[in-house]
Amino acid sequence: MFNGAVSLLFLFLAVVSARADPTFNDDVLGLIVFKAGLDDPLSKLSSWNSEDYDPCNWVGCTCDPATNRVSELRLDAFSLSGHIGRGLLRLQFLHTLVLSNNNLTGTLNPEFPHLGSLQVVDFSGNNLSGRIPDGFFEQCGSLRSVSLANNKLTGSIPVSLSYCSTLTHLNLSSNQLSGRLPRDIWFLKSLKSLDFSHNFLQGDIPDGLGGLYDLRHINLSRNWFSGDVPSDIGRCSSLKSLDLSENYFSGNLPDSMKSLGSCSSIRLRGNSLIGEIPDWIGDIATLEILDLSANNFTGTVPFSLGNLEFLKDLNLSANMLAGELPQTLSNCSNLISIDVSKNSFTGDVLKWMFTGNSESSSLSRFSLHKRSGNDTIMPIVGFLQGLRVLDLSSNGFTGELPSNIWILTSLLQLNMSTNSLFGSIPTGIGGLKVAEILDLSSNLLNGTLPSEIGGAVSLKQLHLHRNRLSGQIPAKISNCSALNTINLSENELSGAIPGSIGSLSNLEYIDLSRNNLSGSLPKEIEKLSHLLTFNISHNNITGELPAGGFFNTIPLSAVTGNPSLCGSVVNRSCLSVHPKPIVLNPNSSNPTNGPALTGQIRKSVLSISALIAIGAAAVIAIGVVAVTLLNVHARSSVSRHDAAAALALSVGETFSCSPSKDQEFGKLVMFSGEVDVFDTTGADALLNKDSELGRGGFGVVYKTSLQDGRPVAVKKLTVSGLIKSQEEFEREMRKLGKLRHKNVVEIKGYYWTQSLQLLIHEFVSGGSLYRHLHGDESVCLTWRQRFSIILGIARGLAFLHSSNITHYNMKATNVLIDAAGEAKVSDFGLARLLASALDRCVLSGKVQSALGYTAPEFACRTVKITDRCDVYGFGILVLEVVTGKRPVEYAEDDVVVLCETVREGLEEGRVEECVDPRLRGNFPAEEAIPVIKLGLVCGSQVPSNRPEMEEVVKILELIQCPSHDLE
């Protein structure tokens, strides 16, 4: 309060001084008033002083020498916050105003463009919000350049924009603008650069674009535009870059594009364009970047591409192209990257690259993933030494690896997996000093793994599985200190596992299964603290498995097939090792008393043998007694602790078990390593009807407590008959137990018997989202709480998808709210337990979500179910959270489907009907509308039209308006 009074007093004195002293002009007053509305944490504006009547010396200010008035104000990246005050309207001679890359908030003042001299306005990179006022462009005078990019502006583009006939540069990218482009936008005949990318704009591009003869750059990417690519775009003869990627454009490329003779970049990826790639594409001689990926182009690659001598980046991936790659591509000597993966190419597709007539090449990336054919890989020639990424996987290549492929010393990634390559791995492999990924898996390679592999010191992933490699694993592999993945499975490797592997501290994944490895496991592997997967199954490994840490939870399937391996995992005890008996040398004799000594030796040997026999008998007798006592103790201990803890769970009417003579003992695993975690003294109350929290398709959830009093939730699974084996169950549990995210419920452990499986996870005190939305009518979530919940669910799902886990069952009852109001996704990963029964269970309703949440692809057996089904469920959840209504509700004579109701309301402009009436209008429309639209997009009937959850998170973070506090 005191500071506010001082600021007002200061401004009053400034105004009085201005009236009293004619030298104190409007510029000084305007700048001081503007500064008063800012927070300047770095004191960048310390030189702005009302006692200094000459602002021309102030930081960021530039004056016109003719008038001695401020003509430029540049405060970009000053770390300023606050709002853009009206004081700047006093700067009548200002022609450049740059406030970019700060943290300014608030809405746009429609009067700024009215400054008669103003030519450049740059407010980009701030946190401005609200709509662009209709009056912002109505009297734009001599305005030349406007950038409002990277803010949080909402609403539609004002029609008044067409009045700014002098505008040459317009950038409204990376906001939350929606609606259609104004039809009169192409009246801006002076436009040279237009960027509307990364918004929510939609509809067809209006006619008239071809009238912008001076247009150099246009970027409409990452929107929801549809229809055809404008047919008159070729009339923009000055165009240098065109980006329409990540939209919904369809149809063929318009022939008028061949007139874009000055264009250097064409990006059309991620649309639904069809037809063949036209021959005239090779007539755009200035092209440097051509990206037509992720469309529906068919036919062959035109030979005319070889005419593009300046081409640097060519991406034709993820189309339906066929035939061969034209050899004319070798004429494109400036190519840096080419990606033609995920097509149907046949024939000799590499000849153009390996028989180039250039002495040098700048090619650094080549990808030809997934195509059909059985060609040989031609020798790598020297002009490809700049290659950094080479992906030739899944192509049916035959022959040997090129002996000189290792001269590609710049390679970061080499993938030749899933071909029919044979022969040995060249010893020059060590020349790949900077390579991070080497994948030669699923081939017919033989011979040994050369010790020179240790020269590839930057290697992070080594995939050589499914080959015919023999010999030993070289100890020098430990030189590759960055390795996190080693997969040598399904080969013919022999010998012992080198102890040097234990020095690879970053290792997370080791698979040496299905080889002929022998010897004992080196003790050094116990040091590998980051291990997630360790598989040595089906070898001849002997000795004892390590104990403790990761190896406590290793599945039986990871070590099975090693008959001489012992330890708790294989349920085989390790025999004690006794010192060898002393053997006397019978040839050591004294010539003087040979016979006597011989007899003495015999007596000694006999006595030693007798002692050994007696000792062995005693050891056996003691061992039998000890084992008996230990068994008695162990049985009583198990019954007191683990068995009591687990079997007590069957007490109560919902856990009644049929009597059996042989009591079944289970396996209890807590990922924290805690022992005796359950308080078993009150077994009757551990899991019974009174402690039940809820029921679902997979089982019943109960609340109980650990011995230290911490509450946990325990789920009794009801899908026991569908789970294949204990090993698969435990493997999946360990994967789920490693997941840690604030928006995902933590799995703490599990319990297994053949007839009973329990999941132990954290107890979330706030209950389900369903209860918060549809439970107590007197409780109403605020908008801020609802937005936080939506964002939390999105982040949790994105995390699960990044961990290759699909939920399959997104609904309000599977989202829990903790005491802090944070959303946590629960009940995830359970479908993975069902293995081959998954499809049957999905279609029978075991995994399906409740009514209204189920993605339409579940009803079609021919459609692959992917993680996009979760995106659909999320979209329905978003609408449920915003509206407060269930996905499907029943009226007297009708069924109301939420998604359809919201879509109709939004299209008809009845936004208030799309938001929970209990909020009584207390919500920011600039947040609510984009959130609703996002929910509708996520709930699209077509899986490919739904965004990925990672993208959804980014969109929500853009939508969020921290300046609004509507609690």
UniProtKB/Swiss-Prot annotation:
Its main location: membrane. It holds the Pfam family LRRNT_2. Residues 631-967 are cytoplasmic. Residues 687-959 form the Protein kinase domain. Residues 21-609 are extracellular. ATP binds at residues 693-701, 715. It is a single-pass type I membrane protein. Glycans are attached at residues 103, 127, 171, 219, 296, 315, 331, 374, 415, 446, 479, 487, 516, 535, 540, 571, 587. Keywords: ATP-binding, Cell membrane, Glycoprotein, Leucine-rich repeat, Membrane, Nucleotide-binding, Receptor, Repeat, Signal, Transmembrane, Transmembrane helix. Leucine-rich repeat receptor-like protein kinase that may play a role in vascular tissues development. This is Leucine-rich repeat receptor-like protein kinase PXC2. It comes from Arabidopsis thaliana (Mouse-ear cress). The lineage of its organism: Eukaryota, Viridiplantae, Streptophyta, Embryophyta, Tracheophyta.
